[in-house]
Amino acid sequence: MALLDYTRRAMLAAGTATAIALSAISVTAQTPDDVLVVGQIAEPKALDPAAVTAVNDFRILMNLYDGLVRYKDGTLEVEPALATSWNISNDGTEYTFSLRQGVKFHDGSDFNADAVKFNFDRMLDEAHPYHNTGPFPLSFFFSAIVSVDVLDPMTVKFTLNAPYAPFLSNLAYPTGLIVSPDAVAKHGTDFGRNPSGTGAFKFGEWRSNEAVVVEANSSHWEGAPKLQAVVFRPITDANTRTAEMLAGGIDMMVEVPPVALSKFQGDGYTVHEQAGPHVWFLILNAKEGPFSDVRVRQAANYAINKEAIVNDVLEGTAAVAAGPTPPAFAWAYNNSLEPYPYNPEKARQLISEAGADGAELTFFVTEGGSGMLDPVAMGTAIQADLQAVGLKVNIETYEWNTFLGEVNPGLEGKADMAEMAWMTNDPD
């Protein structure tokens, strides 16, 4: 899987997550009717779309920025946004975009072909004067780009090193959102705290550990949004988030714990569910420790009762994954694949063969993030299953952004395994 480097391996724990969000029909939060208060699972890492990887951040960024293209609502089909049309060369290596006229960034600067070139050069060219405003962890989405050329003020051409089918889809992903070059030049490495895009909402304020506020952009090219503002509140504890929703402190919450859904069955709430291209998995440190032996990695997959996690922890809001491609990609999904069966006896046998009886494992678990609906409960269930076959598992729990700081660079020297989730727009 693209998320992993070669020193780690992934074991699928549960897949095909159902995204769950909850909204109150009768708004009781102490805010005006045209202000929406959203309960998020964590503080955003940054508000620079090229520098972040988490859905928690993307949820804010999609309001602040536009891309050249975007996904049609509820689909992975691409439609125009800041680009009104495009042509693809016969050999599939050149994409020429005609840009939307008259669009301005929130800071008043012009959106044009130079701005588009700036955005992709900043990510991909190490010699670019603002490449140091990264790192850009998902820049590999655009690694096929050889050059970005300005043909005229409102026409830009991308040249690829080979035909690349997901290119348009990747442009629609949040990593492809277009930022203001002037704002990057002004704020440098602090741009992520001072964002400027072309989106339907503009940045209002960021009160650390309290709220990010975005305000209506009355000059948006699609017209002013109906809401005057959206307030994103980081509420890391799921029980607290649920209590805030019940008390009217927030109007909408995301990543609703499955065990809490029964509290919101009344007429005052609407539950929104949608199956998506989301896979939850375990990262295993295959470079050192017990998981450097393939038999122990296999044993872990046999030991974990994934059906029980789906049914008892996640209340049926997920399905057991058979591989890294979720069924949401119907055209790319192999229905003949079978997941590892639950077989603790086989797990014990493999652990014994590997001489790993009683091995101690450090397991990083996040309090919430990346669409995982109940990661602590999932982690506890995984811990119990592994301990039942002779492995000693010590859980270390982290707030989401702290967790990313520990896990994304790799687990070597720190842990043996970690929970993680991945949502993608492309099955490859």
Residue ranges and their predicted role:
Residues V320-E353, G369-A377:
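Structural transition elements
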Residues T189, N217-K263, T380, K392:
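Ligand-site clamp/hinge motif
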Residues L168-L171, P257, K263-F264, K287, ...:
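Periplasmic-binding protein-like
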Residues K72-D73, Y164-P225, A229, N239, ...:
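Gly/Pro-rich hinge or "lid" segments in bacterial periplasmic/extracellular proteins
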Residues S98, K117, P135-D182:
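Surface-exposed binding/hinge segments that line
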Residues S208, A330, S352-N425:
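Ligand/substrate-recognition segments at binding pockets and active sites
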Residues T84-P129, K157, P290-S292:
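Aromatic- and charge-enriched surface segment that lines or borders ligand/interaction sites
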Residues G39-N90, D121, H128, S196:
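N-terminal lobe/hinge region of extracytoplasmic solute-binding protein
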